[in-house]
Design a protein with these regions (language model features):
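Feature captures the catalytic cores and cofactor-binding loops of soluble hydro-lyases/lyases
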Residues: 1-176
Length: 176
């Protein structure tokens, strides 16, 4: 199937919770809820924060789910149709970084594609204007993580960890 809708973009779970019920967003049944900045670099550990429900006005009308897209993970308890683990994530310049609220999106399940419906010129202009977000680390471990983690498309693992896959083959130094 092919699906089209209008993107409503949130900059992480805090932004989603603050604005989901904002009537100025004009969220209706034809919208895709998008959350970005929640992948392994943007939200170390890539927490399960893509779970999103429609605004209260739609819930009262019986609309209990809208399609969601995110560069992070989601709990298995979410009933919404979802595209998760979008890679590369927005924090490193992936496609979701260029998406704006109001943009039209086309999802083609048969072709396995998700496309923003803007001109190539507009897409190029957005890419040229994009700059990485300033991410503040709360611990040295977050900094190490952000500087060495791969994307969810490759497992979200520390890239340097592949050098240590066979540590059991070498006898460690004696520490006594």
């Amino acid at each position: 199937g092919v699906f089209e809708g209008r993107a409503i973009v949130f900059e992480g779970p805090e932004d989603y919770h603050d604005r989901i019920n904002d009537p100025d967003l004009g969220i209706d049944e034809a919208c895709f809820l998008v959350i970005r900045g929640v992948g392994p670099v943007g939200y170390p550990g890539s927490a399960e924060v893509v779970n999103m429900q429609p605004p209260d006005a739609l819930l009262r009308r019986g609309v209990i789910e809208l399609p969601t897209i995110g560069d992070g993970r989601q709990s298995g308890t979410s009933g919404s149709p979802s595209i998760l683990n979008a890679s590369p994530e927005a924090a490193v310049g992936g496609g979701l970084a260029l998406l704006e609220t109001g943009d039209r999106i086309r999802i083609d399940l048969n072709a396995g594609t998700a496309n923003i419906l803007i001109s190539d010129e507009e897409l190029s202009a957005r890419r040229a204007a994009w700059s990485p977000p300033k991410l503040e680390n709360q611990t040295p471990w977050q900094e190490i993580h952000r500087n060495t983690v791969g994307q969810l498309s490759t497992g979200g693992c520390l890239e340097l960890a592949t050098r240590y896959q066979r540590v059991g083959e070498i006898v460690p130094r004696n520490n006594h």
